[in-house]
């Protein structure tokens, strides 16, 4: 089974720099595990590795697509797995670096994913009719009757997920929650998590936003705002939508910058919650441990010798 290392953690903790250091120590190449770094038109708000950093170590799935293209998690997984195969084919270590937990999870494990068209086709029309006639609450209650465990994990308002779960139950005759629990491992992976004191992370987030503003984030956000027609994924990215009220003349720039810092701190908290609940992570503190990168490199080398 192919060995893969993932380096995860909250925004601004230092994943990119540490991943590059580890890649240089252990002859690896990096696959971005970030849902927004794939887009070539946005660089500042997505905190991509710099051109100089990318020249040091080869990066995959950075600047690979336009914001005007549809790019689903399934597309990401397909391209990332291809990149892992390419890296392994060169005898190098594939290193996933990123903070989008669901994307990393989907990549490392055999999660059942479909593109938008496949997902739409997999929905039972009878449940769509039921939803239209009775609403999200009634739909969720039907799911709760048939599969309480699945219902616990799906918000009442998320009709799309309720539809999918009920459709799977109707089609297979089995519980949706049981099928989700049977997700298989795709790779032999080691997940390294970076984290530190909450206030230290929050301070780094605030500093990063200030540096992004100096680097031209406002103009990048203006580009996104001016192309907001449609359903482009980047419209929902933290770092851009917070400035929309400013461009619309509804809020001051200072207010929007503060909103971005707040949104980024909340996102960091959600990232940590996901990684702690969904993935087997070994945690390290790069902000207080000056030997962190060396300790991680030693741990990876030990793990590389293990058989699975």
UniProtKB/Swiss-Prot annotation:
Any Pfam family matching the protein: IPPT
The keyword Zinc belongs to this UniProt entry's keyword annotation: no
Site, as annotated: Interaction with substrate tRNA: 100
Binding site for substrate: 11-16
Region (Interaction with substrate tRNA): 34-37
Enzyme Commission number(s) of this protein: 2.5.1.75
Native source species: Lactobacillus delbrueckii subsp. bulgaricus (strain ATCC 11842 / DSM 20081 / BCRC 10696 / JCM 1002 / NBRC 13953 / NCIMB 11778 / NCTC 12712 / WDCM 00102 / Lb 14)
Designated name of the protein: tRNA dimethylallyltransferase
InterPro entries from the UniProt entry: Dimethylallyltransferase, IPT, P-loop_NTPase
GO biological process: tRNA modification
Annotated keywords: ATP-binding, Magnesium, Nucleotide-binding, Transferase, tRNA processing
């Amino acid at each position: 089974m192919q060995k893969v290392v993932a380096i995860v953690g909250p925004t601004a903790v230092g994943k990119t720099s540490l991943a590059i250091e580890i890649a240089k120590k252990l002859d690896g190449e990096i696959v971005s595990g970030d849902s927004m770094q794939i887009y070539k038109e946005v660089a500042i708000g997505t905190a991509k590795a710099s051109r100089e950093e990318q020249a040091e170590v080869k990066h995959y799935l950075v600047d690979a697509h336009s914001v005007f293209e549809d790019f689903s998690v399934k597309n990401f997984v397909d391209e990332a797995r291809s990149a892992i195969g390419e890296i392994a084919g060169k005898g190098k270590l594939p290193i996933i670096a990123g903070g989008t937990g669901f994307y990393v999870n989907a990549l490392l494990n055999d999660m059942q994913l479909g593109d938008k068209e496949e997902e739409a086709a997999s929905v039972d029309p009878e449940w769509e009719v039921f939803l239209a006639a009775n609403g999200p609450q009634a739909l969720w209650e039907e799911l709760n009757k048939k599969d309480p465990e699945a219902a616990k994990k799906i918000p009442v308002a998320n009709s799309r997920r309720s539809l999918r779960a009920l459709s799977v139950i109707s089609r297979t005759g089995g519980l949706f929650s049981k099928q989700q629990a049977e997700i298989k491992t795709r790779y032999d992976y080691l997940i390294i998590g970076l984290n530190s004191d909450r206030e230290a992370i929050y301070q780094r987030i605030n500093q990063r936003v200030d540096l992004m503003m100096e680097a031209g984030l406002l103009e990048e956000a203006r580009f996104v705002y001016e192309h907001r027609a449609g359903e482009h994924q980047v419209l929902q990215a933290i770092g851009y939508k917070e400035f929309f009220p400013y461009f619309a003349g509804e809020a001051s720039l200072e207010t929007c910058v503060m909103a971005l810092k707040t949104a980024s701190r909340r996102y960091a908290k959600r990232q940590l919650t996901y990684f702690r609940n969904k993935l087997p992570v070994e945690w390290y503190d790069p902000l207080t441990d000056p030997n962190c990168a060396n300790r991680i490199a030693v741990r990876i080398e030990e793990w590389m010798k293990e058989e699975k």
